[in-house]
A protein has these predicted regions:
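N-terminal secretory signal peptides and thylakoid transit peptides that target proteins
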Residues: 2-22
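C-terminal segment of N-terminal export signals and the immediately downstream linker at the start
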Residues: 4, 26-48, 61, 137-148
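Active-site- and interface-proximal helix/loop "cap" or "latch" segments in soluble metabolic
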Residues: 40-137
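N-terminal Rossmann-like FAD-binding beta1-loop-alpha1 element of flavoenzymes
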Residues: 153-177
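Conserved N-terminal/central alpha/beta ligand/cofactor-binding core
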Residues: 184-298, 347, 425, 432, ...
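A glycine-rich dinucleotide-binding beta-alpha-beta segment and adjacent secondary-structure elements
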Residues: 307, 522, 533-618
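Glycine-rich loop(s) and the adjacent beta-strand/alpha-helix scaffold that form part
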Residues: 326, 331-400, 624-630, 636
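An anion/pyrophosphate-binding glycine-rich loop and adjacent beta-alpha core
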Residues: 373-375, 382-529
């Protein structure tokens, strides 16, 4: 994902009097609006404030007249350029025009929006205004006239699966309308992923030595790994069609290369099937927009599907709402559900995963709230009985934290690395619950299930370990304890090379201030901080294992055993995060939604992570498999829908 430092001053200036018309408001998807009552008196001048966004601190300079905020200048930030540009081009002008700090965030840039709004509100306070009143000022949305569309195919969601389905059907001459909650394609998860797993592609054949990987080999591995839980015929078909899905991506301009993943997987080197996408996010956005336009696909952004139009057991269309409340009716000959699972719905998390602690790995609030799954079940479809999630592999998170670990960057709070560095981990009672090395070696597969079942969990370390990570890092520290980075030994080790947690001391202090990290002079005091009743006994037993060099309880590799004896001691409260959820609608190998008697709902297809017949818990040990199945299923469903429409 491309990043840039802002060395020049990105300047946005406007006045409430001159205004920007309704352009800024319309860009936010708000339609016609009336401003809530707003009046203020300020000390004229310029004021600066800073707040943390998604990847960096954002500093703004605000200029005030006696009666209004007249300008906002971005002094510095290092957010994702294509996302932050929407905050600059849409949100800031709307704030200035309407003199309101309570506007909705840009849906694709929630954290960046929040940082800008918080910083501007701080400047309001410096200028003598009422910060809370400023943040409370909102816009009253007025819905537009009802809209009706008549199309061949309606696709719900424009993420990985929905995008693939849309362009695949559109290129075959079908009239496609796609509904997307986000304000642009930049806001969907599918555009940000590292790459798909696929077999027999031109990318694999083009590399030196070609490829020895075949469909049957991968099929047997994933079916045995999952104990034959997914739909076998669908899985085999996805793997067979994976090359065509990847060729579609290459065809729109994706530059891919086969690459080994950071942790050991069953397929790498001459059998590798992970396709790393080399295009920067900004370029991907351009490629997606062009591909949709070239395929003749119409996308309604800031639009949420609300229900299916059914004629008995046959799908006939979709109802939806725009962000301004406008009602939309889409009459369609077929419908593809690709709304991305339920990560953004805490109630469905609790229902299916038995936790409310699963956070969005990308930060902010996920737009994937289970809409497609609920619509399909309302129409008579049934769900599978396997539920899970695609875990974030970069560290713990916490809803209290301003900088949780969420991307392959070491600019987040380093203390969250203690959620998966192989050090001692305990549950809410202070008891061990896992072989800690699994979370370091295989954070997305073998290590993932127990952390969601035991959330929140706690990383326990002492000062000696903190000092070692601050000066040596995990790579040198673990090699000194006997690990080797040979294949089949400490495979992931090279990933940690030169990744030293040099800012750890200040990050620990930040965690203490935010309330998700505790520091104490004794283990007993540390236990009291989070109510970890059994922690003293656990540490005593764990230290015995460290002395023996053998974990007699869970078999953790000895190079991960780090004795806890040098105070002060630290506990990091961790919550899991995910890229997506698993568990959804049962389908056949044609992606048709099935009823309880296994007969299909005609014209209704379910793809991506809304589909419950392709995924498993814990997540696959094959990198890129979630994204691969998303694009595979989107490709297959589109072709099935095109044939059905005929």
């Amino acid at each position: 994902m491309a990043k840039r430092d802002i060395s020049r001053r990105d300047f946005l200036k406007g006045t409430a009097a001159a205004g920007l018309g309704l352009a800024a408001s319309s860009a936010l998807g708000l339609g016609g609006m009336a401003l809530a009552e707003a009046a203020a008196t300020y000390k004229p001048g310029k004021y600066q404030a800073t707040a943390y966004g998604n990847l960096s601190y954002v500093t703004v300079e605000c200029e005030f007249s006696e009666t209004a905020l007249t300008g906002v200048e971005i002094i510095s930030q290092n957010e994702t350029p294509v996302l932050f540009s929407q905050v600059q081009d849409q949100l800031i002008p709307a704030i200035i025009e309407n003199q309101a700090g309570g506007l909705d965030a840009i849906t694709s840039a929630t954290n960046s929006s929040r940082a800008v709004k918080e910083a501007i509100a701080d400047c309001v306070a410096q200028a003598g205004g009422d910060k809370e009143a400023w943040l409370a000022r909102t816009l009253t949305v007025e819905a537009g006239a009802d809209e009706t569309y008549d199309v061949d195919l309606c696709v719900i969601g424009c993420g990985a699966a929905g995008f693939m389905a849309s362009i695949t059907a559109g290129k075959q001459g079908k009239k496609v309308l796609t509904l997307e909650k986000a304000g642009s394609v930049a806001g969907v998860n599918g555009i940000k992923v590292s790459g798909p797993f696929a077999v027999d592609t031109s990318v694999l054949h083009a590399r030196e030595g070609g490829t020895t990987l075949n469909v049957d080999e991968v099929f047997q591995h994933v079916m045995n790994y999952t104990h034959w839980t997914p739909n076998p015929a669908l899985m085999h078909r996805c793997l067979e069609e994976s090359k065509n899905a990847v060729e579609n991506l290459v065809g729109i301009g994706y530059d891919m290369m086969e690459a080994n993943f950071r942790f050991e997987t069953p397929f790498f080197e001459e059998k590798g099937g992970f396709h790393l996408i080399k295009n920067a996010l900004d370029e991907r956005v351009e490629l997606w927009n062009k591909a949709l336009a070239d395929a003749g696909v119409q996308v309604l952004f800031n639009t949420t599907a609300t229900g299916l139009i059914m004629d008995g057991d046959t799908a006939k269309g979709v109802t939806a709402k725009k962000a301004d409340g406008t009602s939309v009716t889409v009459n369609a000959k077929a419908v593809i559900i690709a709304s991305g699972g339920y990560l953004g719905n805490r109630d469905l998390q609790e229902k299916f995963l038995k936790t409310r602690k699963l956070n969005a790995a990308a930060g902010g609030n996920s737009l994937c709230t289970g809409d497609g799954i609920l619509m399909a079940t309302d129409a008579g479809a049934v769900m599978t009985k396997t539920f899970g999630y695609c875990p974030c592999e970069y560290g713990g998170t916490n809803s209290k934290a301003s900088r949780p670990a969420k991307q392959d960057k070491y600019d987040q709070n380093y203390a969250f690395k203690f959620g998966l560095y192989g050090n001692l981990l305990v549950d809410a009672e202070g008891k061990r619950f896992i072989n800690e090395g699994l979370l370091c070696d295989y954070p997305m597969s073998y290590g993932s299930e127990q952390i969601v079942l035991n959330a929140p969990w706690y990383g326990i370390v002492d000062q000696a370990y903190v000092d070692a990570m601050t000066t040596q890092g995990l790579y040198e520290y673990t090699l000194a304890k006997g690990a080797t980075t040979d294949k089949g030994v400490w495979f992931i080790g090279n990933y940690f090379k030169d990744r030293i947690l040099d800012k750890l001391p200040e990050d620990i202090e930040e965690g203490i201030r935010e309330g998700w990290l505790a520091k104490a002079d004794t283990i007993e005091e540390l236990a009291e901080a989070f109510g970890l009743t059994d922690l003293p006994e656990t540490v005593a037993k764990y230290n015995e294992y460290c002395d023996k060099g053998v974990d007699e309880e869970f078999g953790t590799n000895p190079w991960y055993l780090s004795k806890i004896e040098t105070g002060p001691f630290y506990a990091v409260q961790c919550e899991p995060s995910a890229w997506s959820t698993f568990g959804g609608i049962r389908t056949d190998d044609r992606l048709r939604a099935l009823k309880a008697d296994n007969t299909p709902l005609l014209g209704l297809y379910v793809v991506g992570t809304d589909n419950g017949s392709m995924y498993y818990s814990p997540y696959y040990d094959v990198p890129g498999f979630c994204y691969g199945l998303c694009v595979d299923s989107g490709y297959i469903a589109a072709n099935e829908a095109v044939e059905y429409i005929k």
